[in-house]
Amino acid sequence: MLLKNIKYIVALIFIFYQTSIYSKSTSLEKFDGNNFSKYFSGIVALENRNNSDALDFFDSSKSLIDKHDPYFKKYISSLILENEILKAINLIKYNKSKKIINFFEAYLLLSIDSIKRNELDNANEYLEIAFSFIDNDTINTAILETFKQYIFVFKENKILDNQKNFGNLSLISKTFQKCFLNDSRTDAHFVNLINDNEADFSRYIFFYTSYLIEN
């Protein structure tokens, strides 16, 4: 049950996170010509949202991992956008002792991995580190606060009081939290979500159907 809910959470967060992952390119240091060309092409492809091409270029210039810190962050971003989450997590864990993982996405993924392993205290610790990299970014703040709420639900089997309100994300999140807890009002929350007149939440009919089948 926990693993299934993690899949829902990751899918939910991915929808919101995709809108904020593209960033301006960082100044380039001197590399050998071949790696420079591939790295630069990867940056251009990523900023043009050609995610598959970007990942190919970054894959072919992995020797830059220990030479240029911004490369690793862009490589991880391209993996996320291509839904290669497990590969991104494994790369981050492998390079965990290095300074190159000092960015928001790295600790968010480490937290997700810890939740999947039911290591909830570790997940909280990684979230606290991730908070130091949000730079007043509203979307990243919403993502981290939402994950904190889920971790609390998994640990305490109840919903956190005085949750911060992030609009539609909070509405969706609270519905899934009630679903996890088998709350008697889950049906009503799904119905309200699907029938919301201010936004199209029809994609959540699938989750509601799955909930009805399981119950």
List each language-model region with its residue ranges.
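Generic helix N-cap/helix-start motif at coil->alpha-helix transitions
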Residues: F31-K38, I65-F72, K99-L108, N122, ...
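N-terminal leader/linker segments that initiate helical-solenoid repeat arrays
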Residues: I21-Y75, L81, N102
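Classical Sec-dependent N-terminal signal peptides that target proteins to the secretory pathway
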Residues: L2-S25
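Mid-chain, structured segments of secreted extracytoplasmic proteins
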Residues: D69-I115
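Alpha-helical repeat scaffolds
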Residues: L55-D59, I85-K98, L120-I134, E156-I172, ...
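Residue-level signature for tetratricopeptide repeat
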Residues: V44, S77-S78, D113, I151-F152, ...
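Internal alpha-helical scaffold/solenoid segments in large eukaryotic proteins
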Residues: N51-S52, D56, S202-Y208
